[in-house]
Amino acid sequence: MHKDVKEILFLEEDLKKIVERLGKQITKDYEGKNLLLVCVLKGSVCFMADLMRAIELDCRIDFMDAKSYGNSTVTNGVVSISRDLNYDISDYDIIIVEDIFDSGRTLEKLTQVLSARGPRSVACCSLLDKPERRAQGVELKLDYTGAQVPDAFVVGYGLDYDEKYRNLPYIGILKPEVYSN
């Protein structure tokens, strides 16, 4: 375990089981559809790479970079999109692939932006859900959820603090003294 991690929540084996479960469900739900997975950079990259291999259907992938954190541990409430899709999505069933559903503002904004472009459908898949942190007024519900996590700062498997810890093969709780200095 990394010296800055207080506790491990999900080991590699746990994450693999979560991804396999989600992949099977998406495969069942999207049979015969024109699937486009949209990865929200950067935190979702590990999850997306594993999830797309667990989906037993043809699918396209693309990437968006959107965030509401900046370099902080608390959302500032403003969602900025710095990288957009390369596809005309009007003929696709979209699944937005997110690392963590926290305040909900990022996913809500992306859902609104993509829905306005006229795809066949837009769904949301998040590896982690942190319901205690949901922002007031966010009504978006996840279509696919990997697991719930406590109201703590989590890192690993793509999730970071200040661009560190993304490469950890597990998800753990970061020690508060690391980010409170």
What are these regions (language model features)?
Residues M1-N181:
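PRPP-associated nucleotide enzymes
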